[in-house]
């Protein structure tokens, strides 16, 4: 079952790679236009800035000090738990890969 996902992912990446190569070859003639990566980066940055501004606006509209304390406390507890479990997972993965020596 895992190999199906890897095969599907490989095929998707292969198709995207050929698509990007085709776009890159077509854009070689247009030297003064920005590259695909630059356009994608600018687009992602604009989406990120828009989302960040909307989140800040929503936060400022609904700011409650007691709720803010609760959210900070939940965040601290959850990051501590994730750090602990990530360490356990890393140890298990390393022992699995390293094996008995």
From Swiss-Prot:
Region annotation (Lipoprotein lipase cofactor) maps to 78-101
Which keywords does this chain's UniProt record carry? Chylomicron, Glycoprotein, HDL, LDL, Lipid degradation, Lipid metabolism, Lipid transport, Secreted, Sialic acid, Signal, Transport, VLDL
Start and end residues of each stretch annotated as Lipid binding? 66-74
Cellular component GO terms, alphabetical: chylomicron; high-density lipoprotein particle; low-density lipoprotein particle; very-low-density lipoprotein particle
Q: Does the keyword Transferase apply?
A: no
Question: Which residues, if any, are the signal sequence?
Answer: 1-26
Q: Where in the cell is it found?
A: Secreted
Molecular function (GO) terms for this protein are: phospholipase activator activity; phospholipase binding
Which Pfam families is this protein grouped with?
Apo-CII
Q: What are its GO biological-process terms?
A: lipid catabolic process; lipid transport; positive regulation of phospholipid catabolic process
PTM statement from Swiss-Prot or TrEMBL: Proapolipoprotein C-II is synthesized as a sialic acid containing glycoprotein which is subsequently desialylated prior to its proteolytic processing. Proapolipoprotein C-II undergoes proteolytic cleavage of its N-terminal hexapeptide to generate apolipoprotein C-II. In bovine, proapolipoprotein C-II was found to be the minor form whereas apolipoprotein C-II was found to be the major form in plasma.
Source domain of life: Eukaryota
Function, please?
A: Component of chylomicrons, very low-density lipoproteins (VLDL), low-density lipoproteins (LDL), and high-density lipoproteins (HDL) in plasma. Plays an important role in lipoprotein metabolism as an activator of lipoprotein lipase. Both proapolipoprotein C-II and apolipoprotein C-II can activate lipoprotein lipase.
Q: Which family does it belong to?
A: Belongs to the apolipoprotein C2 family.
Q: What is this protein called?
A: Apolipoprotein C-II
The organism is: Camelus dromedarius (Dromedary)
Q: Give me the gene this protein comes from.
A: APOC2
